[in-house]
Amino acid sequence: MTQRIAITPGEPAGVGPDLIITIAQQDWPVEMVVIASKALLQERSKALSLPLTIIDYDQHAPAKSQKSGSLTVLDVELTEPCVPGTLNSANGSYVVETLRIASEKNISGEFDAIVTGPVHKGLINKAGIAFSGHTEYFATQANCSDVVMMLATKGLRVALVTTHIPLAYVSKAITYERLQKVTRILHKDLQEKFGIKSPKIYACGINPHAGEDGHLGREEIEIMEPAFAELRADGIDIIGPLPADTIFQEKYLAEADAILAMYHDQGLPVLKYKGFGSSVNITLGLPFIRTSVDHGTALELAGKGTADSGSFIEAMNNAINLASNK
């Protein structure tokens, strides 16, 4: 059966629409249903001088693989016309509406996965809509109290205990309960979505040198080690906490199915250095599959045909592979 993958371009003034039109210039073994403004896609394809045939989405028709130069589109009107590279807060509600439709139709089983383009969080909030990120939004839509943000590239997966919070709040956010929940979700999805029978997880400490026996902080001793001990007792193979400045050595990465980082800028700089342009964001713990690009809106590139589509292609391929494991 042909898979049906929902795609949201994200910020209309950014490179999301460009990338979708670019990757549509090849055949795909799935139906790519873009939840977006048809007019926006048509205008952007002309700006890029790329051919585009739009097929109106019919949920009652059987899914068909996507042919080169075509996109299936579920039309959502822009609030106001869009100029590439120029933000307009009036379209913040449009962006959120595309995400709402995508999540609802994935929860219902109409789609097999969601692939999301980059959004501008500040603009959505400026529009009066509280929004801290895709991960948190989809968790709310799916009524999930706990989800996990993981980024992946060739040879490295990094999951985060905390995501989009100020660094000053990180230490208090890393609790015994949070470590338990995040690690269990990571372990479960590595098994069920990635087909890894016995996942091995390496965990970073939070302090320099993982606290150095409590001399540089006691979170490792008082919170992390007891949490990991209970996880091991339940059969979860987790190693750590280890110093974050040494955990990314090849000798560890060769064994690790995932690295568990305590905060956003502890784990992601290494991953993006290793695979920028070819890494993908994956949300774990949702009742549906969601992948995304690993970059921002790149407003300065919108409509110019110079944006790199590598991460979007990886996000698509990961979504297809994960959906095949369901």
Curated annotation (Swiss-Prot):
- Which positions does UniProt annotate for a divalent metal cation binding? H164, H209, H264
EC number(s) recorded for this UniProt protein = 1.1.1.262
Q: What single Pfam family name could you report for this chain, choosing any that match?
A: PdxA
- Where in the cell? Cytoplasm
**A single GO molecular function, which one?**
zinc ion binding
What HAMAP family does UniProt report for this protein, alphabetically? PdxA
Q: How does it assemble?
A: Homodimer.
The protein in question is named 4-hydroxythreonine-4-phosphate dehydrogenase
- What organism is this sequence from? Colwellia psychrerythraea (strain 34H / ATCC BAA-681) (Vibrio psychroerythus)
